[in-house]
Amino acid sequence: MSDKARLHLVPVRSREAREFVHVWHRHHPPPAGQIFAVGAADEMGTLRAVAIVGRPVARHLDDGATLEVTRTASDGTRNTNSLLYGASWRAAKALGYRRLITFTQEGESGASLRGAGWRLIASRPPRAGWHTPSRPRAGNGNDHVARSLWEAP
């Protein structure tokens, strides 16, 4: 697809968004739930990227006024993630939410977030994981990885 291709926003059903994330996301499975999803499609109507927005994963951030972009996934088409981060914030505000956050992992630049006007507000050190001898648990994919917390403008 050309760098000059025109992208537009499209509604995406939960199942379609989850399938897209399953195919294209680099390191996580689709999230368990969502409030809404939005997609970016090209001029031919081909879905090029999705954003899934839901309740914050961290309980202390789940205050009823905050949502979290829990996944974005793209087929590599330029500018799709910035488009989706901006659209997600506009949709969240229209639904009455006052805050939208997301996390990036160490090694991810955050260029799409900066392009959409988001602010880096905190850095989180790597977690040791949830496994304990009394309660064995499998890792969830982002243990031992530093993360950055971003907030919509």
Predicted regions and their residues:
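Active-site beta-strand termini and strand-to-loop segments that position acidic
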Residues: A40-E43, E151-P153
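Class I (Rossmann-like) S-adenosyl-L-methionine-dependent methyltransferase catalytic domain
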Residues: D143-S148
